[in-house]
UniProtKB/Swiss-Prot annotation:
Protein name: Guanylate kinase
InterPro entries reported for this sequence: GK/Ca_channel_bsu, Guanylate_kin-like_dom, Guanylate_kinase, Guanylate_kinase_CS, P-loop_NTPase
Key words of the record: ATP-binding, Cytoplasm, Kinase, Nucleotide-binding, Transferase
Organism field: Pseudomonas savastanoi pv. phaseolicola (strain 1448A / Race 6) (Pseudomonas syringae pv. phaseolicola (strain 1448A / Race 6))
Protein residues bound to ATP: A13, P14, S15, G16, A17, G18, K19, T20
Record field: catalytic activity: GMP + ATP = GDP + ADP
GO cellular component terms given for this protein: cytosol
Length: 214
């Protein structure tokens, strides 16, 4: 039986661009009956030292650990990548990521541009997607509408967003989240197209190809 290895997808975006909502909608869509056996996308659960927010579940949204535990994991070489964002540490478990790909699942890794660089250096075969807001004003409005942060923090997030967006040209694909439904279809199209590459089809239909060319 042919073994199919999953594909790693790096998805980055400034805070407020809608990355989390788009990824959730993508995951929800693959549960629809018409997707059938093709539904095999997973989302990587990162480790972080930041405080848990209302509604979040440990092990589902993030693996929440204290800074001492995070540093210990760095020293043990447990992370494929790690970064510090707004004073909080984030990291991706190397062993869990590889296990998921070896099981044939496509895996989404939601990380910033710094983490993306680290991952691409070690896994150049990974696909990369950057999500942009339609305008800076739209981004600011989305951050304000969250009602989670003070004006000072929103300004800091806007500065960070501009810095993050300046790295969009390091990614293979760019999705502009102006219309949510349209952006979701763009995201789905990237995943569908990648499954139709010659290499992926060769893995999935190797016996068929051998028969056709016999």
């Amino acid at each position: 039986m042919t073994h199919i290895t999953g594909t790693l997808y790096i998805i980055s975006a400034p805070s407020g661009a809608g990355k989390t909502s788009l990824v959730k909608a993508l995951m929800d869509a693959q549960q629809e009956p018409q997707h059938g056996a093709q539904a095999k996308i997973r989302v990587s659960v990162s480790h972080t030292t930041r405080a848990m927010r209302p509604g979040e579940v440990n092990g589902v949204n993030y693996n929440f650990v204290d800074r001492a535990e995070f540093v210990r994991m760095i020293e043990h070489g447990d992370f494929l990548e790690q970064a510090e964002v707004f004073g909080n540490l984030y990291g991706t478990s190397q062993s869990h990521l590889q296990q998921t790909l070896d099981e044939g699942h496509d895996l989404i890794l939601e990380i910033d541009w710094q983490g993306a660089r680290q991952v691409r250096a070690q896994m150049p075969q990974a696909r990369s997607i950057f999500i942009l807001p339609p305008t800076q004003q739209a981004l600011r409005q989305r951050l304000t509408n969250r009602g989670q942060d003070s004006d000072e923090i929103i300004e800091a997030r806007m500065r960070e967003a501009v810095s993050e967006m300046s790295h969009y040209n390091e990614y293979e694909y760019v999705v502009v989240n102006d219309d949510f439904a349209g952006a979701l279809e763009d995201l789905k199209a990237i995943f569908r197209a990648n499954r139709l590459t010659q290499q992926h089809q060769q893995e999935q239909y190797s016996e068929l190809f051998q028969e056709l060319l016999a």
